[in-house]
């Protein structure tokens, strides 16, 4: 089995993801009001973990890079389960093991890393020493179906919030692994071409990463400060077979 995956994001009205670029709100609210609202709405979804990409994680929590040069190749690819006193995980996709973890509890949760099989034994020792859980997702670290089975069967995780960035969301969209979309729409605009949007799959021009996936609107709620919360259920073509 795999956990339920809810892609939970905040964007501007034009779908952009960089809040520092948004126009100022019409409403008289605190500077951190919308970001706090996003997190509060996320808590309503009652997930046991959030999942983000390496760039997003390092931008917020552990900026240093681990050098694995000359290390010993891993020969045993068993998952490692560290303690989880909070009952919630922050899971990061780090296929090559680039993050140097300085602490094991980002945002009051417990850290977990999804790795590729090309990391070194020394890096695994580093993770265990700091108290970071880990598991493997195939040779290149992109076998999410395998990773999700481990998350469910070994770690007991049944509900995950996928929180970007755009490229990571695109990978999951292409793989057909998203079950719901929870989108909080900020009452403002970015407007510039090329700024990351909610889903950005890096593929060929003729690829259609969302093919065979239809959205059912579950709810549309106007929140305080003009924020709009949209919830959709994904229906995949295989669901109808």
Where are these regions (language model features)?
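Enzymes that bind and transform nitrogen-containing heteroaromatic metabolites
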Residues: 1-241
